[in-house]
Amino acid sequence: MNFSIKSVIFLAIVALATLVSASTNPKVTNKVYFDIKQGDKDLGRIVLGLYGEVVPKTVENFRALATGEKGYGYKNSKFHRVIKDFMIQGGDFTRGDGTGGKSIYGERFADENFKLRHTGPGILSMANAGRDTNGSQFFITTVTTSWLDGRHVVFGKVIEGMDVVTAIETTKTLPGDRPATPVIIADCGELPVSNNNDAKAEL
């Protein structure tokens, strides 16, 4: 009996440790890139690692919009909202002002889960208009934004190109936090995942 109880306790500890590991150091299952332009200037490339084992539906939506395989997506869309010491927001490829966008599942889809947290700069998370209103809009943090935990679905992190994120974050803005010179995703798509180097996101 004692052996059986010890076995159950051991398995429970292993399961808990696995869950904690998945939520604090999730595996990068997919990578996408954004090539960014502002006016005539190439700002560079942002590479984003996606956590498909934790939030597979959210990741698939973002990945497919990055590749444009559904006939629509992020290419030539804007970062329409930029707030220094907070985040940069994009993904509204239908209206370009933060009121549009759509997912590959329809106009909106439900919050998948809130297992991952907004722990620092470079976190990739879904923008929304309230509970279960995810579409195509997303944001990348430039600081820790723990007050967004449990409200926005985290699904990835910047692997390369935080300097580009910073350049966008610090650009001159107009009323409504809109960049004075439009910041455009000139090209985007998917990259192969290297198990050795891509597991660790850029801090």
UniProtKB/Swiss-Prot annotation:
Extent of the signal sequence: 1-22
Intervals of motif Prevents secretion from ER: 200-203
Subcellular location(s) of the protein: Endoplasmic reticulum lumen
GO BP term, pick one: protein folding
InterPro entries listed in its UniProt record: Cyclophilin-like_dom_sf (IPR029000), Cyclophilin-type_PPIase (IPR024936), Cyclophilin-type_PPIase_CS (IPR020892), Cyclophilin-type_PPIase_dom (IPR002130)
Binding site for cyclosporin A: W147
A Pfam family the protein falls into: Pro_isomerase
Reaction(s) this enzyme catalyzes, per UniProt: [protein]-peptidylproline (omega=180) = [protein]-peptidylproline (omega=0)
EC number(s) per entry: 5.2.1.8
Molecular functions (GO terms): cyclosporin A binding; peptidyl-prolyl cis-trans isomerase activity
Domain PPIase cyclophilin-type: residue ranges: 33-190
Domain of life: Eukaryota
Keywords recorded for this protein, A-Z: Endoplasmic reticulum, Isomerase, Rotamase, Signal
Principal location listed in the UniProt entry: endoplasmic reticulum
PROSITE patterns associated with the record: CSA_PPIASE_1, CSA_PPIASE_2
Gene3D superfamilies in UniProt: Cyclophilin-like (2.40.100.10)
Record PANTHER family: PEPTIDYL-PROLYL CIS-TRANS ISOMERASE (PTHR11071), PEPTIDYL-PROLYL CIS-TRANS ISOMERASE D-RELATED (PTHR11071:SF561)
Function: PPIases accelerate the folding of proteins. It catalyzes the cis-trans isomerization of proline imidic peptide bonds in oligopeptides.
Family, as annotated: Belongs to the cyclophilin-type PPIase family. PPIase B subfamily.
Protein name from the UniProt record: Peptidyl-prolyl cis-trans isomerase B
Species this protein is from: Orpinomyces sp. (strain PC-2)
Source lineage: Eukaryota, Fungi, Fungi incertae sedis, Chytridiomycota, Chytridiomycota incertae sedis
